From Swiss-Prot:
The lineage of its organism: Eukaryota, Fungi, Dikarya, Ascomycota, Saccharomycotina. Residues 1-31, 156-200 are annotated as: Interaction with PHO80. GO terms for molecular function: DNA-binding transcription factor activity; protein dimerization activity; sequence-specific DNA binding. Gene3D superfamilies: Helix-loop-helix DNA-binding domain (4.10.280.10). The modification Phosphoserine is found at residues 100, 114, 128, 152, 204, 223, 242-243. It comes from Saccharomyces cerevisiae (strain ATCC 204508 / S288c) (Baker's yeast). Binds DNA as a homodimer. Interacts with transcription factor PHO2 and binds cooperatively to PHO5 UAS. Interacts with the cyclin-CDK PHO80-PHO85 and the CDK inhibitor (CKI) PHO81. Residues 250-306 form the bHLH domain. This is Phosphate system positive regulatory protein PHO4. Residues 35-71, 138-259 are annotated as: Disordered. Residues 138-154, 196-210 have a biased composition (Polar residues).
Length: 312
C-alpha cells in the first residue's frame, strides 16, 4: 500500500487505508473468535450428551480440556475488545466538514483473512458499522461475567474458596478488627517454705523480715493467704471419701489379712519340716546357709534317704 501525493478524495482514502486495514484485522479477529466460541459451545452441548454415557474419569478430563479452551477463547476476545476500545474512532464518523458524499462512498469494505489465528475455520469477514457498539457492549458483558466468576479477591482470600455464594463472607471483619483473646492471668506466687503456726523457729525480729523475703519462708498463722484451719486432717479426709472409696478400703484390708495368713501358714510348715530332719544328717548333707529353699531341699533328700533304707 503506497501513499500518493495527490490531494482530494483519493488522497484522503490513501490516508485511511492503514487504519482501515488494522480495523479489518481486529474485526476479523473478533468475529472468528466469536464464531469459534459459539461453535465450541454447540460442540460442548453434544459432547455433554455423549459424555453422560462414558466413565466418570474420562468425562472429567474432557470437561477440563473444554473449560481451558473456553477460557483461552474468552481471553483472546477480551484482548481484541481492549484493542478496539483503545483506538480512536473519530476518523470513521462522517461528521468532518471536508468529507463529501463521494468520499464516504469510495470507502468500500474489503475482505481479509486474519493472519493472527491459525485455524482452518477462518472465514472472510467484513467490518460492520455497528462494530464499536457491539465491541463495547460485549466487553462490558464479559467484564460482568468475569466479576461474577472471580468475585472480590479480598473476600475470596478471607473465605478460602471462590464465588460469592456464601453470604457470611460479606460480614467478615478485617484483620485489624478481629478480637484478640484475653491474656491468661498469672499464677499466684506462693512462698517456697511454709512453717506451721506452732513451729519453734528462733529468729530475731530484726532479721525476720529480710530472711522471710529472701528465703520465701512464711509462718502459717502470720500469713493472710494461709489461715489456720481448726478441723483435723483425718476428719477432712473422712468427709471427702465417698461410698466407692470405702468399699475399696474394705477390699484392700481383707486382701492384706488373707496374705498375712498365707505367709504365716508357710512359715509354720517350714519350721515343722526343718524340725523333722535330724541335726546330724543335716550337718553331713547340707552345706549351704539355712533358708527356706535349703530347708525344702534338705527335706526332699532326707525323704529319698528314708525310702532307700526301707526298700533295702
Amino acid at each position: 500500500m503506497g501513499r500518493t501525493t495527490s490531494e482530494g478524495i483519493h488522497g484522503f482514502v490513501d490516508d485511511l487505508e492503514p487504519k482501515s486495514s488494522i480495523l479489518d484485522k481486529v474485526g476479523d479477529f473478533i468475529t472468528v473468535n466469536t464464531k469459534r466460541h459459539d461453535g465450541r459451545e454447540d460442540f460442548n452441548e453434544q459432547n455433554d450428551e455423549l459424555n453422560s454415557q462414558e466413565n466418570h474419569n474420562s468425562s472429567e478430563n474432557g470437561n477440563e480440556n473444554e473449560n481451558e479452551q473456553d477460557s483461552l477463547a474468552l481471553d483472546d476476545l477480551d484482548r481484541a475488545f481492549e484493542l478496539v476500545e483503545g483506538m480512536d474512532m473519530d476518523w470513521m464518523m462522517p461528521s468532518h466538514a471536508h468529507h463529501s458524499p463521494a468520499t464516504t462512498a469510495t470507502i468500500k469494505p474489503r475482505l481479509l483473512y486474519s493472519p493472527l489465528i491459525h485455524t482452518q475455520s477462518a472465514v472472510p469477514v467484513t467490518i460492520s458499522p455497528n462494530l464499536v457498539a457491539t465491541a463495547t457492549s460485549t466487553t462490558s458483558a464479559n467484564k460482568v461475567t468475569k466479576n461474577k466468576s472471580n468475585s472480590s479477591p479480598y473476600l475470596n482470600k478471607r473465605r478460602g474458596k471462590p464465588g460469592p455464594d456464601s453470604a457470611t463472607s460479606l460480614f467478615e471483619l478485617p484483620d485489624s478488627v478481629i478480637p484478640t483473646p484475653k491474656p491468661k492471668p498469672k499464677p499466684k506466687q506462693y512462698p517456697k517454705v511454709i512453717l506451721p503456726s506452732n513451729s519453734t523457729r528462733r529468729v530475731s525480729p530484726v532479721t525476720a523480715k529480710t530472711s522471710s523475703s529472701a528465703e520465701g519462708v512464711v509462718v502459717a498463722s502470720e500469713s493472710p493467704v494461709i489461715a489456720p484451719h481448726g478441723s483435723s486432717h483425718s476428719r477432712s479426709l473422712s468427709k471427702r471419701r465417698s461410698s466407692g472409696a470405702l468399699v475399696d478400703d474394705d477390699k484392700r484390708e481383707s486382701h492384706k489379712h488373707a496374705e498375712q495368713a498365707r505367709r504365716n501358714r508357710l512359715a509354720v510348715a517350714l519350721h515343722e519340716l526343718a524340725s523333722l530332719i535330724p541335726a546330724e544328717w543335716k550337718q553331713q548333707n547340707v552345706s549351704a546357709a539355712p533358708s527356706k529353699a535349703t530347708t525344702v531341699e534338705a527335706a526332699c533328700r532326707y525323704i529319698r534317704h528314708l525310702q532307700q533304707n526301707v526298700s533295702t
